[in-house]
Amino acid sequence: MAVAGRRLASVAEITVVRAGVERLDELVGFWKLLHRHQSSVAAAVPGLDVLSESDSSVIVGKMYREWLSGPDSFAFFAEEDGRLVGYVVGFYDEPHFMWSTGRVGHIDSFYVLPELRGRGVGRLLMEAAYAEMRQAGATTVALEMVANNDVARRFYEREGFTTTFVQMHRQLAPD
């Protein structure tokens, strides 16, 4: 299933296409790009240890395979002239046990190649994710990001996201 492509200013036609488990290697390849970016951003966050790219990729590959083999997740690629330029992976949760949110769609992984940022590729991927979530009955979209990732924060705020929770971490010393 292809989501309608659009001609964007200064960008050839971008097409958003569904990615299933049959494209797992490509999804993990994009995870590696996201991991490198997140690792560089996270380096400035005290106490946030990052798994190696290889260890993380094995875990994410298993997670994506499990998710995409079931009904409660999705993945999309953005393509420009047959070249992959971005991706989004998400999943669904039932309503929160305390907050009146309805079914929740989660953006787990989202990445656009740096040279295409600011040209509408991310917006097209998010529109595909929102449409998928609406179809699955989600009424809210949630995501997490590294606290000091100001570029991502600005993008998500332009997309209408607001900060509702703060996740905190503390390192435990060994006994």
Task: Give residue spans per PLM region.
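Conserved GNAT-fold acetyl-CoA-binding loop/helix
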Residues: 35-63
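Glycine-rich acyl-CoA binding loop
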Residues: 78, 118-126
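Active-site acidic-Proline motif in GNAT/NAT acetyltransferases
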Residues: 113-115, 119, 147-148
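Conserved active-site alpha-helix within GNAT-family acetyltransferase domains
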Residues: 123, 127, 135, 139, ...
